[in-house]
């Protein structure tokens, strides 16, 4: 399949590495390192400031809800002992173990243009992530309240960029079946471009993964100031899938499909 820029989707690979190695330690804490400040300056963030203390879990919430680059880089820097190249090597090794064949990871957050992937690989990565209960729980929240920190006197509310999760603010994007998702870029307002979105939805026991890659901003016809083309196409796919397909019993064991004559039986002539 076609290789595309991964952008913020790179965080799914960082989250996969965190959960693979630290799923039972998510309430451990770390201090946001100053060393990553210049790299993530003026990019997608959750206002997690240098020397503030966070749990691994809080960093994951920031990544999933706000596509926060400082959360990804800060956690990677901490867990790798400052060896970000080593962290990236682990990302690529795990990616290959998961089964990806057309992805390359060059940083922990997606700022670097060398991060590339494809629809099939993102499907494999998301399916792997869905095996972790913590990921499923974190992905499904429309908002997360970040506790007060050293440089934040009051808690702050992180509103998920996945508008499909919010009944109150998601508007036409909202779908009750949406379970979670991540985009490569947030949205387009005065600028233009393409967007990718990887997500999953569930209804009546049926789960589908959606990997919509490089949707042009012009395809979003909902009319909002912020255009989310890949999310627009995703929710339309969700509608089509659940309107079109349903889980049916493969075979009713009490239903007779045919009658076969039986020879040499004293009890019956047919089965």
Show which residues each predicted segment covers.
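Domain-terminus/edge residues, biased toward the C-terminal soluble/receptor-binding domains
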Residues: 100-101, 113-117, 121, 126-271
């Amino acid at each position: 399949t076609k290789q595309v820029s991964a952008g913020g989707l790179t965080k799914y690979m960082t989250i996969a590495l965190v959960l693979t190695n630290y799923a039972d330690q998510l309430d451990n804490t770390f201090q946001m390192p100053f060393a990553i400040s210049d790299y993530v300056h003026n990019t997608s963030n959750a206002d997690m400031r240098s020397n503030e203390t966070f749990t691994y879990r809080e960093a994951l919430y920031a990544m999933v809800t706000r596509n926060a680059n400082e959360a990804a880089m800060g956690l990677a820097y901490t867990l790798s002992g400052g060896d970000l190249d080593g962290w990236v090597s682990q990302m690529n090794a795990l990616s290959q173990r998961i089964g990806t064949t057309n992805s390359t990871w060059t940083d922990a957050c997606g700022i670097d243009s060398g991060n590339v992937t494809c629809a099939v690989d993102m499907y494999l990565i998301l399916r792997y992530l869905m095996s972790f209960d913590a990921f499923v729980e974190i992905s499904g929240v429309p908002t997360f309240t970040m506790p007060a920190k050293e440089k934040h006197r009051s808690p702050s509310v992180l509103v998920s960029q996945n508008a499909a999760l919010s009944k109150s603010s998601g508007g036409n994007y909202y779908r009750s079946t949406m379970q979670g998702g991540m985009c490569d870029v947030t949205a387009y307002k005065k600028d233009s471009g393409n967007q990718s979105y990887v997500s999953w939805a569930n209804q009546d026991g049926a789960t589908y993964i959606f990997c919509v890659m490089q949707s042009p901003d012009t395809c979003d016809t909902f009319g909002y100031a912020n255009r989310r083309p890949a999310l627009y196409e995703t929710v339309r796919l969700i509608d089509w899938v659940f309107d079109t397909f349903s889980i049916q019993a493969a075979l009713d064991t009490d239903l007779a499909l045919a009658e076969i004559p039986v020879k040499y039986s004293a009890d019956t002539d047919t089965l």
